[in-house]
Amino acid sequence: MTSGPQSYLLHRGDVLDAYKEWPSPTCIISDGAYGVRGFNGDTISEDGLVEWYRPHIAEWSERSSPGTSLWFWGTEVGWATVHPELKRQGWDYVQTVIWDKGLSHIAGNVNGKTIRQFPVVTEVCVLYQRRFEVLVDGSSLDAQAWLRHEWRRS
């Protein structure tokens, strides 16, 4: 048994039901739909990924702070498809990490008679930072513009 504040909370079920009770996250790790039929509810291609992620990104954006980091896991084409929506909802791209799973990942998954392309042995994990924005007189200002505005105002 541990004492002190709880360091994590595990929710079992649909995360869309859990967001309303989320505290402001420091780090979000998303390992959702890839567009490869990986689980019940995943899309069958990159088509539909933006619609699948849109409500999640909206919740992340609403509850996060300017210091929140997002690690977005997916396939190369899946991430490239969702990236514009992340940007539109206030997330700034930082870097991409490519996970090379190696040859053992394809063992048993490749048939020499039917293979027509290189087997997929990578995933991407893309780091985003929540964009710092301040609303002033109906306009959204980044940190530099806001500091300049405050300096001129004072």
Feature map (PLM): residue ranges:
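Core catalytic lobe of class I
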Residues: T2-S154
